[in-house]
C-alpha cells in the first residue's frame, strides 16, 4: 500500500499562521486542566507596559518562555502561562497627556482627575489590544481567559491588602525624606527612571571664611570648598573634611561663615570625603544631595530645603530635622534677590556674587554625570518631600536567604552577586508617586491631620467609629508601579483568596527577565511573595524557582535599539515584511529633529534598500532561540534570520519528499531495516538527549542548534539520499523499512522542533499523522520525544560515519580535479581492516549509488594501484584511478597542500613531545596517544609523497 498527497513547493507562513493560531485558541489547547494530580508548570510573563507595542526584546523573551511552556505541555504537565499587561503609571500618563495636548490642546487639569483617568482607560483598551494581538502573532500559547491587567479589580484588591497589612505591621510609614524629584512632571521617580548623562561641567572653588579668627595650618583665614552645584549653597549646613586629612585636623569642630547667607556652619569630619577631590573640603547640603543627606544624618545636621517643586529658589527655606519633622530652633534666611530664581539662573548669580565678594578662588573644567528624568527629560533634583515608604530590610533578609539557600537559582549564576550586592545595601523604598494614573494610596485624612489606612473609606469609618458627617479626604498620590507588579505571581492567581489556582500553580517555575530589573522587580517580587504567601506548613513561598536572566537584543552593529537612534526593529515586520517606504515612515515619522530624521533615513536606506522581506514567525522564533547564549547581549543578525527561513523551507521540502513520494510503502508485510535506518534512529535519539539537556540548562541556543544540525545535516543531506538507492533497487521489505523509518523519524522530528517552531510543525504534522497512524487533533498535545536507549546504535553510527567519510573523500576528489558529478568512477581502497572490508561488502550498492561509482575494489597492503588521486580517511587510502582525465598541475598542487598540512601536524606533535613540562605532567596514555598519532601522520606523509612522485614522473 502506498499513500501520498499534494504539498505546495514552499511553506507559505502568511497563509497558515493566523488560521492555525485561531484554531488552537478556539479549541482551548492553551488552557490548563483542573486535574490537581498532574504535575504543574507555570510561568508568569513579565507584563509588558500598556503604553505601546512589543519590541524585539519582548519577542526574544516570550519565544524562550513559549518554548518552555510548549515543551512542558507536551511532557504531560498541567501548564499555565499567565499573561497580562502593566499599567506603567508615569509612562502611560505621559503618553495620554501628550496625545490630548497634540489632538485637543488640553492638559489633564482641563479634564480633571476622573475624566482624565477615563481617557487613560480608553487608551488602555486600544493599546492593550494591540499587545495581545502581537503576542498571538508570535505564537504564544497563552490562556487568554486568564489575562490580567495590574489595575484589574482583583489585583487592586491585592494591592490594598498588602498595603494595609504592611502598615499594620509597621513596615509602611509616611515621612519626609530625600527623593529623586522630577521638577517638570512634579513627581518622585525611581532610580530606574533616572538616566545619568555625561556632561562637560565646572568645578567651582569657593572661599568660606573661617569664623572666630581661626586659621588653617598654612595661615589662611578661609577654607576653599569645591562644588559642582553652586545653586544649593544657600542650603549648606556644614562643610566636611576627612578625619585623617592633616591639613584640616585642627579645624574639626570649628565653624565657617556661609557667604551670601551669613550664618555660621560647623566643620565636620567624615570618611565620605575624598581627600583627592578638589581641595579635600566639601560643602554639605543634606536637603539637596543624597550623599550629603547621609552625612547630615550621621552628624545630626539640619536639612535646609531652598527649592520649590519647580526647582526654583524658595521665598522661605523649609528647615527639617533628621527625624523628618519641622525644626523651629534653626534659622536660615534666603536673601530677597534669590527668591523665585530658576535654579540655573540662581547658579549664575551665586557664582557672580562670590566673585564680587572676592570669594571665587578658581573655576576648573570638570566631567560629570548629570541625572535626568527619562520621561520629563530635565535634570532631576534630590528633594525633601512627604512620601510613603516601605521599610524593606526585614523583607530583604528573608529574600536574600532564599537565594543563598538555593531555593531560588539565578541562571547565569553570576547574577546572584548582583542581587546580593543590592539586597545587602537596601534602603527604605519610596512607594508614592505624585501622579493620577495608578493604584491610589489607601489612606484618608481628616481636617485635624489624622491619617487612617484601610481597604476602603467605609472600612476606615467602621474601624475608627467615625461619624458620617466627618469629612475624609483620600491621599492624592498613587503607588509606584513596581509595588503592584511586585505581587504579580500570586495576585494573578487570585490572592488574597486561597484559590485552587494559587495552590496548583504557585510557586511558578521560572522567571525570564532582563538584568536591568533584577532589583526593581525581581527582588521586590521575592520580598513580597515570601512575606505574604506561605505553604501549608506556614513556610514562606518563593515566587519562582529559577530566574533566567537574558541579555539585551542590540542591532547588527551592537548598538542598543532606540527610537532616537532610528534602529528599532519591529518583530511583526520580521514576520510579515515591510516596504522601505513604510519602514522609513515608521522610523522618522513625527520626529521633532529634521536633521536626525535625515540621518536615520540614510542609514535605513543603506541597510534595507529593498525593505524587509517576510520571514514568518517560525524563522523569527528559531533565530531568537539560536542567538540566546547565556546572559550575553545579542547582536541581531538579518542573515541568520534569512538562513533560518531557508531552514523552514528545508524542513518543508524534506517533508514533501517523504509525503509525496510515490514509492513510499507503508503496507503490512515483511520489514527489513537497513544500516541507514538504524543510524538515523540512533542519531535522532542522541539529538533528543542533546535538546533535553540543553533546555534543562536554559541553553536555548544549543537546543536550536541540535535541531538544526540533525534536520539539515543528518536527515536531509544524508538520510533522504541514503533512502534513494533503497527505493530504486531494494527489496519490498527494505522499501517498507525505509518508508516506515522516514515517516516515523519525520513525525518525531516535528514533535522535537514544535516548541520552538510551532506553526510549520503543526502544519506538516497534520499531513504526517495519517501516514504515521496517529489519531489526534494537534501536535501540541502529543508527547515530547524521549531518548529510547534501545534505539541507540553505536555500531550503526560508526559504520555510516565511516561510509560518509569515504563518500565525502570521493566528492572532494571530484571537486578538486574538476570531474563531473555524474561521471562514473572506479574506487580503490587500501589498508582497510577486516571489519571495514565487511562494511564495504555489505554496503557496496549504497556506496556506488551515493558516490556515483562504477566499481568498488579493496587492494591488499602491498598491491600497487594504477596512477590515482589519493585521499586519506584515517589510515585508509581512498584511490581514484585518473587515467584519461588527470590534470597534472592541479593534482600536484592539491597534493602539495595535503603534504604541507601533514607536515604541520607532525611538527605540532614533535613540539608537544619535545616539551619537557608536557611529558612530565601528561598521563602515559595521553603521551602514547600522541605517539600513535605521529606514526599515523608519518605513514600518511610517506603515501602522499609516493603519490606525488608518481604523478610528477608522468
Curated annotation (Swiss-Prot):
Gene Ontology molecular function: aminoacyl-tRNA deacylase activity; ATP binding; valine-tRNA ligase activity
Explain the purpose of this protein: Catalyzes the attachment of valine to tRNA(Val). As ValRS can inadvertently accommodate and process structurally similar amino acids such as threonine, to avoid such errors, it has a 'posttransfer' editing activity that hydrolyzes mischarged Thr-tRNA(Val) in a tRNA-dependent manner.
State the family it belongs to.
Answer: Belongs to the class-I aminoacyl-tRNA synthetase family. ValS type 1 subfamily.
* Chain positions of motif 'KMSKS' region: 560-564
- Swiss-Prot/TrEMBL catalytic activity: tRNA(Val) + L-valine + ATP = L-valyl-tRNA(Val) + AMP + diphosphate
User: How is this protein named in the record?
Assistant: Valine--tRNA ligase
Q: Where in the cell is it found?
A: Cytoplasm
Amino acid at each position: 500500500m502506498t499513500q501520498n498527497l499534494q504539498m505546495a513547493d514552499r511553506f507559505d507562513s502568511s497563509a497558515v499562521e493566523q488560521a492555525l493560531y485561531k484554531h488552537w485558541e478556539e479549541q482551548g489547547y492553551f488552557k490548563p486542566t483542573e486535574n490537581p494530580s498532574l504535575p504543574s508548570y507555570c510561568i508568569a510573563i513579565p507584563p509588558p507596559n500598556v503604553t505601546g507595542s512589543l519590541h524585539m526584546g519582548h519577542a526574544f523573551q516570550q519565544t524562550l518562555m513559549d518554548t518552555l511552556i510548549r515543551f512542558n505541555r507536551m511532557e504531560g504537565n498541567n501548564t499555565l502561562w499567565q499573561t497580562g499587561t502593566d499599567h506603567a503609571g508615569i509612562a502611560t500618563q505621559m503618553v495620554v497627556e501628550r496625545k490630548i495636548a497634540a489632538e485637543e490642546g488640553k492638559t489633564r487639569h482641563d479634564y480633571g482627575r476622573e475624566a482624565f483617568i477615563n481617557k487613560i482607560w480608553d487608551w488602555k483598551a486600544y493599546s492593550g489590544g494591540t499587545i495581545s494581538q502581537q503576542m498571538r502573532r508570535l505564537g504564544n500559547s497563552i490562556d487568554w481567559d486568564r489575562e490580567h491587567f495590574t489595575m484589574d479589580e482583583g489585583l487592586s484588591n491585592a494591592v490594598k491588602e498588602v498595603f494595609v497589612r504592611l502598615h499594620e505591621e509597621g513596615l509602611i510609614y509616611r515621612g519626609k525624606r530625600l527623593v529623586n524629584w522630577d521638577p517638570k512632571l512634579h513627581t518622585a521617580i525611581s532610580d530606574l527612571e533616572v538616566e545619568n548623562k555625561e556632561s562637560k561641567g565646572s568645578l567651582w572653588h569657593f572661599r568660606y571664611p573661617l569664623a572666630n579668627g581661626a586659621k588653617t595650618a598654612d595661615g589662611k583665614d578661609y577654607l576653599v570648598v569645591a562644588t559642582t552645584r553652586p545653586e544649593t549653597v544657600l542650603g549648606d549646613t556644614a562643610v566636611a573634611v576627612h578625619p585623617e586629612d592633616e591639613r584640616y585636623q585642627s579645624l574639626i569642630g570649628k565653624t565657617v561663615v556661609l557667604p551670601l547667607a551669613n550664618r555660621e556652619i560647623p566643620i565636620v569630619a567624615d570618611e565620605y570625603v575624598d581627600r583627592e577631590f578638589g581641595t579635600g573640603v566639601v560643602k554639605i547640603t543634606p536637603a539637596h544631595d543624597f550623599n550629603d543627606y547621609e552625612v547630615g544624618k550621621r552628624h545630626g545636621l539640619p536639612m535646609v530645603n531652598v527649592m520649590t517643586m519647580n526647582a526654583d529658589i524658595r521665598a522661605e527655606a523649609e528647615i527639617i530635622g533628621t527625624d523628618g519633622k519641622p525644626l523651629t530652633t534653626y534659622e536660615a534666611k534666603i536673601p530677597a534677590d534669590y527668591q523665585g530664581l530658576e535654579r540655573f539662573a540662581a547658579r549664575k548669580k551665586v557664582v557672580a556674587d562670590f566673585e564680587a565678594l572676592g570669594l571665587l578662588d578658581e573655576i576648573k573644567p570638570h566631567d560629570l554625570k548629570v541625572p535626568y528624568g527619562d520621561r520629563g527629560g530635565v535634570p532631576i533634583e534630590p528633594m525633601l518631600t512627604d512620601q510613603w515608604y516601605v521599610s524593606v530590610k526585614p523583607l530583604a533578609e528573608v529574600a536574600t536567604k532564599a537565594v543563598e539557600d538555593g531555593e531560588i537559582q539565578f541562571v547565569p549564576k553570576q547574577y546572584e552577586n548582583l542581587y546580593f550586592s543590592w539586597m545587602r545595601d537596601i534602603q527604605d523604598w519610596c512607594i508614592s508617586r505624585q501622579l493620577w494614573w495608578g493604584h491610589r494610596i489607601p489612606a484618608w485624612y481628616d481636617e485635624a491631620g489624622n491619617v487612617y489606612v484601610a481597604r476602603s473609606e467605609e472600612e476606615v469609618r467602621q474601624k475608627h467609629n467615625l461619624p458620617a458627617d466627618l469629612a475624609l479626604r483620600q491621599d492624592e498620590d498613587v503607588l509606584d508601579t513596581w509595588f503592584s507588579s511586585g505581587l504579580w505571581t500570586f495576585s494573578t492567581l487570585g490572592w488574597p483568596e486561597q484559590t485552587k489556582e494559587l495552590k496548583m500553580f504557585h510557586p511558578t517555575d521560572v522567571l525570564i527577565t532582563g538584568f536591568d530589573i533584577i532589583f526593581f522587580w525581581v527582588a521586590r517580587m521575592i520580598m513580597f511573595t515570601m512575606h505574604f504567601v506561605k505553604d501549608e506548613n506556614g513556610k514562606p513561598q518563593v515566587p519562582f524557582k529559577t530566574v533566567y536572566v537574558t541579555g539585551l537584543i542590540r542591532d547588527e552593529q551592537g548598538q542598543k535599539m532606540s527610537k532616537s537612534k532610528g534602529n528599532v526593529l519591529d518583530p511583526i515586520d520580521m514576520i510579515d515584511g515591510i516596504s522601505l517606504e513604510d519602514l522609513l515612515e515608521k522610523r522618522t515619522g513625527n520626529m521633532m529633529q529634521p536633521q536626525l530624521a535625515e540621518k536615520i533615513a540614510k542609514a535605513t536606506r543603506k541597510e534595507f534598500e529593498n525593505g524587509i522581506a517576510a520571514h514568518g514567525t517560525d524563522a523569527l522564533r528559531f533565530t531568537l532561540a539560536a542567538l540566546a547564549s547565556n546572559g550575553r547581549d545579542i547582536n541581531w543578525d538579518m542573515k541568520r534570520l534569512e538562513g533560518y527561513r531557508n531552514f523552514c523551507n528545508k524542513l518543508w521540502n524534506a517533508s514533501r519528499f517523504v509525503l509525496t513520494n510515490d514509492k513510499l510503502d507503508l503496507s503490512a508485510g515483511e520489514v527489513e531495516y537497513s544500516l541507514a535506518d538504524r543510524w538515523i534512529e540512533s542519531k535522532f535519539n542522541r539529538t533528543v538527549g542533546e535538546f533535553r539537556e540543553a533546555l534543562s540548562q536554559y541553553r536555548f541556543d544549543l537546543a536550536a542548534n541540535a535541531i538544526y544540525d540533525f534536520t539539515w545535516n543528518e536527515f536531509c543531506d544524508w538520510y533522504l539520499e541514503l533512502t534513494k538507492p533503497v527505493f530504486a533497487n531494494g527489496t519490498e521489505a527494505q522499501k517498507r523499512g525505509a518508508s516506515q523509518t522516514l515517516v516515523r523519524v519525520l513525525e518525531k522530528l516535528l514533535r522535537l522542533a514544535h516548541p520552538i517552531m510551532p506553526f510549520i510543525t503543526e502544519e506538516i504534522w497534520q499531513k504526517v499523522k495519517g501516514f504515521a497512524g496517529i489519531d489526534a487533533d494537534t501536535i501540541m498535545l502529543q508527547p515530547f520525544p524521549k531518548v529510547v536507549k534501545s534505539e541507540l546504535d553505536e555500531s550503526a553510527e560508526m559504520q555510516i560515519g565511516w561510509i560518509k567519510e569515504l563518500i565525502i573523500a570521493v566528492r572532494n576528489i571530484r571537486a578538486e580535479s574538476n570531474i563531473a558529478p555524474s561521471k562514473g568512477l572506479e574506487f580503490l581502497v587500501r589498508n582497510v581492516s577486516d571489519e571495514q572490508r565487511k562494511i564495504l561488502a555489505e554496503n557496496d550498492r549504497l556506496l556506488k549509488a551515493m558516490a556515483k561509482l562504477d566499481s568498488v575494489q579493496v587492494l591488499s597492503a602491498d598491491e600497487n594501484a594504477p596512477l590515482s588521486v589519493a585521499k586519506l580517511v584515517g589510515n585508509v587510502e581512498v584511490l581514484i584511478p585518473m587515467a584519461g582525465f588527470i590534470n597534472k598541475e592541479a593534482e600536484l598542487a592539491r597534493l602539495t597542500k595535503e603534504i604541507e598540512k601533514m607536515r604541520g601536524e607532525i611538527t605540532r606533535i614533535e613540539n608537544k613531545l619535545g616539551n619537557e613540562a608536557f611529558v612530565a605532567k601528561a598521563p602515559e596514555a595521553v603521551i602514547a596517544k600522541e605517539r600513535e598519532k605521529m606514526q599515523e601522520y608519518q605513514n600518511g606523509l610517506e603515501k602522499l609523497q609516493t603519490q606525488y612522485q608518481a604523478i610528477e614522473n608522468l
